[in-house]
Regions:
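N-terminal loops that bind phosphate or other acidic moieties
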Residues: 2-133, 137-375
Length: 375
Protein backbone atom coordinates (compact mmCIF):
# COMPACT_ATOMS: atom_id res chain seq x y z
CA UNK A 1 0.00 0.00 0.00
CA UNK A 2 1.31 3.42 -0.95
CA UNK A 3 0.31 6.44 1.12
CA UNK A 4 1.18 10.04 0.30
CA UNK A 5 1.11 12.45 3.25
CA UNK A 6 0.85 16.21 2.67
CA UNK A 7 -0.37 18.11 5.72
CA UNK A 8 -0.30 21.88 6.17
CA UNK A 9 1.29 23.29 9.30
CA UNK A 10 -0.63 23.45 12.56
CA UNK A 11 0.22 27.10 13.22
CA UNK A 12 1.84 27.63 16.58
CA UNK A 13 2.18 23.89 17.08
CA UNK A 14 3.60 21.69 14.29
CA UNK A 15 5.36 22.46 11.05
CA UNK A 16 4.16 20.74 7.90
CA UNK A 17 6.95 18.18 8.03
CA UNK A 18 6.51 17.54 11.77
CA UNK A 19 2.80 16.86 11.24
CA UNK A 20 3.57 14.66 8.24
CA UNK A 21 6.19 12.59 10.05
CA UNK A 22 3.86 12.09 13.02
CA UNK A 23 1.19 10.82 10.62
CA UNK A 24 3.71 8.54 8.93
CA UNK A 25 4.56 7.00 12.29
CA UNK A 26 0.89 6.19 12.85
CA UNK A 27 0.49 4.66 9.39
CA UNK A 28 3.51 2.42 9.86
CA UNK A 29 2.25 1.23 13.23
CA UNK A 30 -0.90 -0.01 11.51
CA UNK A 31 0.81 -1.13 8.27
CA UNK A 32 4.54 -1.73 8.79
CA UNK A 33 5.06 -2.60 5.12
CA UNK A 34 3.37 0.51 3.72
CA UNK A 35 5.28 2.80 1.39
CA UNK A 36 4.75 6.23 2.98
CA UNK A 37 5.87 9.39 1.19
CA UNK A 38 5.80 12.65 3.16
CA UNK A 39 5.66 15.93 1.24
CA UNK A 40 5.72 19.48 2.64
CA UNK A 41 2.55 21.52 2.22
CA UNK A 42 1.90 25.26 2.29
CA UNK A 43 -0.35 27.72 0.51
CA UNK A 44 2.18 30.38 -0.41
CA UNK A 45 1.53 32.36 2.76
CA UNK A 46 3.28 32.48 6.11
CA UNK A 47 5.52 29.48 6.68
CA UNK A 48 5.93 28.55 3.02
CA UNK A 49 9.66 29.23 2.97
CA UNK A 50 10.39 27.14 6.04
CA UNK A 51 8.09 24.31 4.89
CA UNK A 52 9.85 23.98 1.55
CA UNK A 53 13.32 24.29 3.07
CA UNK A 54 12.56 21.43 5.46
CA UNK A 55 10.61 19.31 3.01
CA UNK A 56 12.85 19.66 -0.02
CA UNK A 57 16.24 19.77 1.65
CA UNK A 58 16.79 23.46 1.00
CA UNK A 59 19.22 25.89 2.54
CA UNK A 60 18.19 28.82 4.72
CA UNK A 61 19.88 32.09 3.82
CA UNK A 62 19.79 34.82 6.47
CA UNK A 63 20.35 38.47 5.66
CA UNK A 64 19.62 42.00 6.81
CA UNK A 65 17.43 44.14 4.58
CA UNK A 66 15.54 47.41 4.70
CA UNK A 67 12.27 46.90 6.54
CA UNK A 68 8.94 48.54 5.74
CA UNK A 69 9.77 51.51 7.98
CA UNK A 70 13.15 52.06 6.36
CA UNK A 71 15.10 50.54 9.23
CA UNK A 72 17.12 47.29 9.07
CA UNK A 73 15.31 44.00 9.74
CA UNK A 74 16.52 40.42 9.83
CA UNK A 75 15.02 38.31 7.05
CA UNK A 76 15.62 34.96 5.39
CA UNK A 77 14.77 33.03 2.27
CA UNK A 78 15.20 29.47 1.07
CA UNK A 79 17.50 28.10 -1.60
CA UNK A 80 16.78 24.87 -3.46
CA UNK A 81 20.09 23.98 -5.10
CA UNK A 82 18.77 21.27 -7.43
CA UNK A 83 16.27 23.69 -8.94
CA UNK A 84 18.48 26.79 -8.59
CA UNK A 85 15.40 28.34 -7.04
CA UNK A 86 14.85 30.83 -4.23
CA UNK A 87 11.74 30.67 -2.05
CA UNK A 88 10.82 34.09 -0.66
CA UNK A 89 8.04 35.61 1.40
CA UNK A 90 7.67 39.33 0.87
CA UNK A 91 6.37 39.58 4.44
CA UNK A 92 9.87 38.74 5.69
CA UNK A 93 11.00 42.17 4.47
CA UNK A 94 7.81 44.22 4.22
CA UNK A 95 5.19 42.38 6.24
CA UNK A 96 2.52 43.89 8.41
CA UNK A 97 3.90 41.82 11.28
CA UNK A 98 6.93 44.14 11.22
CA UNK A 99 4.86 47.27 11.83
CA UNK A 100 3.17 48.29 15.07
CA UNK A 101 -0.38 49.59 14.86
CA UNK A 102 0.81 53.12 15.63
CA UNK A 103 3.45 52.90 12.88
CA UNK A 104 1.15 52.00 9.99
CA UNK A 105 1.53 54.63 7.29
CA UNK A 106 0.77 53.72 3.67
CA UNK A 107 2.38 56.96 2.53
CA UNK A 108 5.85 55.96 3.70
CA UNK A 109 6.16 52.17 4.18
CA UNK A 110 8.24 50.52 1.48
CA UNK A 111 8.91 47.23 -0.31
CA UNK A 112 12.59 48.13 -0.80
CA UNK A 113 13.72 45.17 1.29
CA UNK A 114 11.90 42.74 -1.00
CA UNK A 115 14.07 43.94 -3.85
CA UNK A 116 17.15 43.57 -1.68
CA UNK A 117 16.27 39.93 -1.02
CA UNK A 118 15.89 39.26 -4.75
CA UNK A 119 19.14 41.09 -5.50
CA UNK A 120 20.99 39.04 -2.89
CA UNK A 121 19.73 35.81 -4.45
CA UNK A 122 20.73 36.96 -7.93
CA UNK A 123 24.23 37.74 -6.69
CA UNK A 124 24.46 34.13 -5.51
CA UNK A 125 23.63 32.93 -9.01
CA UNK A 126 19.98 32.08 -8.37
CA UNK A 127 17.74 32.66 -11.37
CA UNK A 128 14.36 31.14 -10.47
CA UNK A 129 12.06 32.61 -7.85
CA UNK A 130 8.93 31.45 -6.05
CA UNK A 131 7.59 34.36 -4.04
CA UNK A 132 4.66 34.58 -1.65
CA UNK A 133 3.25 38.11 -1.42
CA UNK A 134 0.68 37.77 1.35
CA UNK A 135 0.71 39.73 4.61
CA UNK A 136 2.08 43.01 3.27
CA UNK A 137 2.26 46.28 5.18
CA UNK A 138 2.73 48.30 2.02
CA UNK A 139 0.77 50.22 -0.59
CA UNK A 140 3.64 51.49 -2.75
CA UNK A 141 2.86 49.69 -6.01
CA UNK A 142 6.10 47.76 -5.63
CA UNK A 143 8.12 50.86 -6.42
CA UNK A 144 10.45 50.25 -3.48
CA UNK A 145 11.26 46.73 -4.65
CA UNK A 146 11.90 47.97 -8.17
CA UNK A 147 14.25 50.71 -6.97
CA UNK A 148 16.29 48.14 -5.07
CA UNK A 149 16.58 46.22 -8.34
CA UNK A 150 17.98 49.24 -10.15
CA UNK A 151 14.95 50.90 -11.73
CA UNK A 152 15.04 54.67 -11.35
CA UNK A 153 11.87 56.69 -10.80
CA UNK A 154 12.19 60.46 -11.13
CA UNK A 155 9.89 63.43 -10.66
CA UNK A 156 9.49 66.23 -13.19
CA UNK A 157 12.70 67.82 -11.89
CA UNK A 158 14.72 64.65 -12.39
CA UNK A 159 14.91 63.90 -8.67
CA UNK A 160 14.25 60.57 -6.98
CA UNK A 161 10.59 60.22 -6.01
CA UNK A 162 11.26 58.78 -2.57
CA UNK A 163 9.59 55.82 -0.86
CA UNK A 164 6.09 54.63 -0.05
CA UNK A 165 2.69 55.42 -1.44
CA UNK A 166 3.49 59.13 -1.45
CA UNK A 167 6.10 58.52 -4.17
CA UNK A 168 3.58 57.27 -6.72
CA UNK A 169 2.05 60.62 -7.65
CA UNK A 170 5.52 62.09 -8.19
CA UNK A 171 6.61 59.61 -10.86
CA UNK A 172 7.27 61.43 -14.10
CA UNK A 173 9.90 59.28 -15.79
CA UNK A 174 11.38 55.79 -15.44
CA UNK A 175 14.90 54.81 -16.40
CA UNK A 176 14.51 51.16 -17.32
CA UNK A 177 18.09 50.82 -18.54
CA UNK A 178 19.37 51.15 -14.97
CA UNK A 179 17.66 47.92 -13.90
CA UNK A 180 19.89 45.01 -12.93
CA UNK A 181 20.63 43.23 -16.24
CA UNK A 182 20.51 39.84 -14.53
CA UNK A 183 16.74 40.26 -14.18
CA UNK A 184 16.40 39.30 -17.84
CA UNK A 185 17.79 35.85 -16.98
CA UNK A 186 15.32 35.27 -14.15
CA UNK A 187 11.85 33.76 -13.89
CA UNK A 188 9.40 34.89 -11.23
CA UNK A 189 6.48 32.76 -10.06
CA UNK A 190 4.24 34.60 -7.62
CA UNK A 191 1.89 32.89 -5.18
CA UNK A 192 -1.18 35.11 -5.34
CA UNK A 193 -4.66 34.26 -4.11
CA UNK A 194 -6.40 37.57 -4.79
CA UNK A 195 -7.82 38.74 -8.11
CA UNK A 196 -8.18 42.46 -7.43
CA UNK A 197 -7.04 44.98 -10.04
CA UNK A 198 -4.59 47.73 -9.14
CA UNK A 199 -6.97 50.69 -8.92
CA UNK A 200 -10.59 51.56 -8.27
CA UNK A 201 -13.08 50.56 -5.60
CA UNK A 202 -11.98 46.91 -5.89
CA UNK A 203 -8.30 47.77 -6.09
CA UNK A 204 -5.36 47.63 -3.71
CA UNK A 205 -6.01 50.86 -1.84
CA UNK A 206 -9.74 50.57 -1.17
CA UNK A 207 -9.91 46.85 -0.43
CA UNK A 208 -6.69 46.13 1.46
CA UNK A 209 -5.56 49.63 2.39
CA UNK A 210 -7.64 50.07 5.56
CA UNK A 211 -5.79 47.28 7.38
CA UNK A 212 -2.53 49.04 6.50
CA UNK A 213 -3.55 52.46 7.76
CA UNK A 214 -5.37 53.92 4.76
CA UNK A 215 -8.07 56.26 6.05
CA UNK A 216 -11.12 57.44 4.08
CA UNK A 217 -9.50 60.88 3.92
CA UNK A 218 -6.50 59.69 1.90
CA UNK A 219 -7.95 56.67 0.08
CA UNK A 220 -9.02 58.60 -3.03
CA UNK A 221 -5.72 60.47 -3.19
CA UNK A 222 -3.72 57.25 -2.91
CA UNK A 223 -5.83 55.47 -5.49
CA UNK A 224 -5.37 58.34 -7.93
CA UNK A 225 -1.62 58.25 -7.27
CA UNK A 226 -1.60 54.53 -7.99
CA UNK A 227 -3.47 55.14 -11.23
CA UNK A 228 -0.96 57.83 -12.22
CA UNK A 229 1.93 55.43 -11.52
CA UNK A 230 0.24 52.79 -13.68
CA UNK A 231 -0.17 55.27 -16.54
CA UNK A 232 3.49 56.29 -16.47
CA UNK A 233 4.51 52.63 -16.27
CA UNK A 234 2.42 51.86 -19.35
CA UNK A 235 3.99 54.78 -21.20
CA UNK A 236 7.57 53.70 -20.54
CA UNK A 237 7.21 49.91 -20.58
CA UNK A 238 4.59 49.67 -23.33
CA UNK A 239 2.35 47.27 -21.42
CA UNK A 240 -0.78 47.61 -19.33
CA UNK A 241 -1.42 45.31 -16.37
CA UNK A 242 -3.39 47.69 -14.15
CA UNK A 243 -6.61 45.74 -14.71
CA UNK A 244 -5.01 42.30 -14.57
CA UNK A 245 -6.19 39.85 -11.93
CA UNK A 246 -3.86 40.08 -8.95
CA UNK A 247 -2.36 43.45 -9.91
CA UNK A 248 -3.75 44.86 -6.67
CA UNK A 249 -2.17 42.17 -4.50
CA UNK A 250 0.19 43.29 -1.73
CA UNK A 251 -0.49 46.97 -2.26
CA UNK A 252 0.25 46.81 -5.97
CA UNK A 253 3.27 44.54 -5.71
CA UNK A 254 1.47 42.15 -8.05
CA UNK A 255 1.34 44.93 -10.63
CA UNK A 256 5.08 45.54 -10.30
CA UNK A 257 5.89 41.87 -10.83
CA UNK A 258 3.64 41.67 -13.89
CA UNK A 259 4.71 44.93 -15.50
CA UNK A 260 8.43 45.03 -14.77
CA UNK A 261 9.53 41.44 -14.13
CA UNK A 262 7.32 39.49 -16.54
CA UNK A 263 6.12 37.33 -13.67
CA UNK A 264 3.31 34.79 -13.56
CA UNK A 265 0.72 35.01 -10.79
CA UNK A 266 -0.67 31.66 -9.67
CA UNK A 267 -2.91 30.58 -6.77
CA UNK A 268 -0.58 29.77 -3.91
CA UNK A 269 -1.59 26.17 -3.38
CA UNK A 270 -1.22 25.35 -7.09
CA UNK A 271 2.24 26.89 -7.19
CA UNK A 272 3.43 25.04 -4.11
CA UNK A 273 1.98 21.68 -5.15
CA UNK A 274 3.86 22.02 -8.41
CA UNK A 275 7.07 23.01 -6.61
CA UNK A 276 7.02 19.92 -4.38
CA UNK A 277 6.07 17.70 -7.35
CA UNK A 278 3.13 16.23 -5.45
CA UNK A 279 1.20 15.10 -8.53
CA UNK A 280 4.05 12.81 -9.56
CA UNK A 281 3.69 10.90 -6.27
CA UNK A 282 -0.11 10.80 -6.45
CA UNK A 283 -0.18 8.99 -9.79
CA UNK A 284 0.13 5.58 -8.11
CA UNK A 285 -0.91 6.22 -4.52
CA UNK A 286 -3.67 4.26 -2.78
CA UNK A 287 -4.48 6.70 0.01
CA UNK A 288 -3.70 10.38 0.45
CA UNK A 289 -3.46 11.97 3.90
CA UNK A 290 -3.81 15.71 4.34
CA UNK A 291 -4.98 18.19 6.96
CA UNK A 292 -4.35 21.45 8.79
CA UNK A 293 -4.79 22.94 12.24
CA UNK A 294 -8.49 23.66 11.81
CA UNK A 295 -10.91 22.23 9.27
CA UNK A 296 -13.87 24.52 8.59
CA UNK A 297 -15.90 26.08 5.77
CA UNK A 298 -12.85 28.08 4.65
CA UNK A 299 -10.96 24.84 4.05
CA UNK A 300 -13.59 23.79 1.54
CA UNK A 301 -13.21 27.09 -0.31
CA UNK A 302 -9.81 26.08 -1.62
CA UNK A 303 -7.27 25.99 1.18
CA UNK A 304 -4.27 23.66 1.05
CA UNK A 305 -5.95 20.36 2.09
CA UNK A 306 -8.62 20.73 -0.60
CA UNK A 307 -5.93 21.52 -3.14
CA UNK A 308 -4.30 18.21 -2.26
CA UNK A 309 -7.63 16.38 -2.38
CA UNK A 310 -8.56 17.67 -5.81
CA UNK A 311 -5.20 16.61 -7.20
CA UNK A 312 -5.46 13.18 -5.57
CA UNK A 313 -8.92 12.62 -7.04
CA UNK A 314 -7.47 12.88 -10.53
CA UNK A 315 -5.90 9.50 -9.86
CA UNK A 316 -8.74 7.90 -7.92
CA UNK A 317 -7.07 8.06 -4.52
CA UNK A 318 -9.03 8.00 -1.28
CA UNK A 319 -8.37 11.15 0.78
CA UNK A 320 -8.35 11.31 4.57
CA UNK A 321 -7.79 14.54 6.51
CA UNK A 322 -6.71 15.12 10.11
CA UNK A 323 -7.01 18.38 12.02
CA UNK A 324 -6.50 19.82 15.46
CA UNK A 325 -10.13 20.92 15.48
CA UNK A 326 -13.11 20.38 13.20
CA UNK A 327 -16.13 22.67 12.95
CA UNK A 328 -19.66 21.55 11.97
CA UNK A 329 -19.23 23.42 8.67
CA UNK A 330 -16.28 21.20 7.78
CA UNK A 331 -18.71 18.71 6.22
CA UNK A 332 -18.43 20.89 3.10
CA UNK A 333 -14.95 19.38 2.70
CA UNK A 334 -16.53 16.05 1.71
CA UNK A 335 -17.96 17.56 -1.45
CA UNK A 336 -14.57 19.17 -2.12
CA UNK A 337 -12.76 15.83 -2.36
CA UNK A 338 -11.97 14.86 1.22
CA UNK A 339 -13.61 11.47 1.78
CA UNK A 340 -13.35 11.55 5.56
CA UNK A 341 -11.87 13.82 8.21
CA UNK A 342 -11.00 13.33 11.86
CA UNK A 343 -9.97 15.56 14.76
CA UNK A 344 -6.81 14.39 16.50
CA UNK A 345 -7.54 15.78 19.97
CA UNK A 346 -8.50 13.12 22.49
CA UNK A 347 -10.83 14.19 25.26
CA UNK A 348 -11.33 17.52 26.98
CA UNK A 349 -8.19 19.65 27.05
CA UNK A 350 -7.05 23.24 27.06
CA UNK A 351 -5.95 24.92 23.83
CA UNK A 352 -2.43 25.26 25.21
CA UNK A 353 -2.24 21.55 25.97
CA UNK A 354 -3.62 20.61 22.56
CA UNK A 355 -1.14 22.87 20.77
CA UNK A 356 1.87 21.69 22.74
CA UNK A 357 4.10 20.14 20.03
CA UNK A 358 4.73 16.98 22.03
CA UNK A 359 1.01 16.41 22.60
CA UNK A 360 0.10 17.33 19.03
CA UNK A 361 2.58 14.82 17.60
CA UNK A 362 1.33 12.09 19.90
CA UNK A 363 -2.30 12.86 19.11
CA UNK A 364 -1.60 12.86 15.37
CA UNK A 365 0.21 9.53 15.48
CA UNK A 366 -2.51 7.87 17.55
CA UNK A 367 -5.42 9.21 15.49
CA UNK A 368 -3.80 8.20 12.20
CA UNK A 369 -2.88 4.75 13.48
CA UNK A 370 -6.43 4.02 14.61
CA UNK A 371 -7.97 5.16 11.31
CA UNK A 372 -5.47 3.16 9.27
CA UNK A 373 -6.24 0.00 11.22
CA UNK A 374 -9.53 0.08 9.31
CA UNK A 375 -7.84 0.44 5.94
Amino acid sequence: MKVVVAIDSFKGSLTSIEAGMAAKEGILKAHPDANVVVKPLADGGEGTTDALIAGLGGERIDLTVTGPLGTPVNAHYGYLAEKNTAILEMAAAAGIILVRESEKNPLTVTTYGVGEMIADAMERGIRNFIIGIGGSATNDGGIGMLKALGYQFSNENGQDVGEGGQALERVSSIIIEKANPILKECSFHIACDVTNPLCGKNGATYIYGPQKGVTPEIAEELDQAMNHYASVTSKFLHNDYASAEGAGAAGGLGFAFLSYLNATLTPGIDLILNAVELEKELEDTDITVTGEGRLDHQTAMGKAPVGVARLAKKYGSKVVAFAGSVTPEATACNAAGIDAFFPIVRGITTLAEAMDPKNAKSNMTTAVEQVFRLL
